[in-house]
Amino acid sequence: MTSATTAPHTTQTLQFHPRVAESVATQRGEGWSIQAVQELLDLPFMELLWRAQATHRTHWPQGDIELATLLSVKTGGCPENCGYCPQSAEFDTGVKAEKLMNVQEVTQAAQAAKDAGATRFCMGAAWRAPKDRDIEKISELITAVKDLGLQTCATLGMLQSHQAQALKDAGLDYYNHNLDTAPEYYSDVVSTRQYQDRLDTLRHVRDAGINVCCGGIVGMGEAPVHRAGLIAQLANLNPYPESVPINSLVRVAGTPLADSEPVDPLDFVRVIAVARITMPKARVRLSAGRQQLGDAVQALCFLAGANSIFYGDKLLVTGNPDVEADTQLLAKLGLKGTPNQTTTETACGA
């Protein structure tokens, strides 16, 4: 009688993107390996939450929740093919291309956001990369919003170094440019730009002295090792981002990822917790997909170290809990919004 042989177990390994590998080599210590991040993700759930909460209390003893509002100032018609995005011109999602909003429209929206309690106002434009004339118009919006006493953020696509400097000169506090996922899974999501393009934009933003807002999306069909790879990439940026938005994929009909399997809610909480542990001084933001999480999962995310949310009933073109619902949730949990201040944060150490 012969016994069946079992194939040896193999473990998939990922390598840092060259730009990040170089950054890791220059920082103190050894940085975060993908294996180390994966080991955190694999901890027993309660142990992981305990570690994340302990880290959070150490670095954020005030326990406030930053309220940020995101407005699409130029919607639709983007030439990129990001598989999650309903604003791509490549997909039939019902989103129509619109022109850039004017200063009066944007300042009215920003004032309304401030009146509702928001302290940061982010302006998003569906461009692959803005032209210099676009930067001039966006700079006017930044100055106008800044004059209202709000922190300013923009997400406009890829930037050149002189454009980043122009935004800084206009008073921009934060620039958002997400990595989306690990580099090894990136081509499964988008093919119209390279991972290196994203890292180059982040470098231009950092060199200009603008705070970095950079995170990713969970639930795009990625494997657990890709989630570990994304977190390692973010945590090993030197310095790591001041703001780290973690999105749960909003599946929009017409996009290639519309039929993706929903992420397990507790797996999403795990990502929040590990982001907090690996980037202790960052604002970890609950971003897109909060509406589908529900109050209980959001409460676990706050326990795991999330301390920022996008505030308002719409994120670009997808739904978000309305202001009243968020106000009630925060009150139920005994959480308070961050006091309004326009001073920028110092860079986070890696």
Swiss-Prot record:
SMART domains attached to this UniProt entry: BATS, Elp3
Residues annotated as binding [2Fe-2S] cluster = 122, 153, 213, 285
Q: In which pathway does it act?
A: Cofactor biosynthesis; biotin biosynthesis; biotin from 7,8-diaminononanoate: step 2/2
Keywords linked to the UniProt accession? 2Fe-2S, 4Fe-4S, Biotin biosynthesis, Iron, Iron-sulfur, Metal-binding, S-adenosyl-L-methionine, Transferase
Q: Which GO terms describe its molecular function?
A: 2 iron, 2 sulfur cluster binding; 4 iron, 4 sulfur cluster binding; biotin synthase activity; iron ion binding
**Cofactor notes:** Binds 1 [4Fe-4S] cluster. The cluster is coordinated with 3 cysteines and an exchangeable S-adenosyl-L-methionine.
CDD domains, per this entry?
Radical_SAM
Q: Which cofactor does it need?
A: [4Fe-4S] cluster; [2Fe-2S] cluster
- Family annotation (Pfam families): BATS (PF06968), Radical_SAM (PF04055)
Every copy of the Radical SAM core domain together lies at 63-281
Per the similarity annotation, which family is this? Answer: Belongs to the radical SAM superfamily. Biotin synthase family.
| HAMAP family reported in the protein's UniProt record | BioB
Q: What is this protein called?
A: Biotin synthase
Species for this entry: Acidovorax sp. (strain JS42)
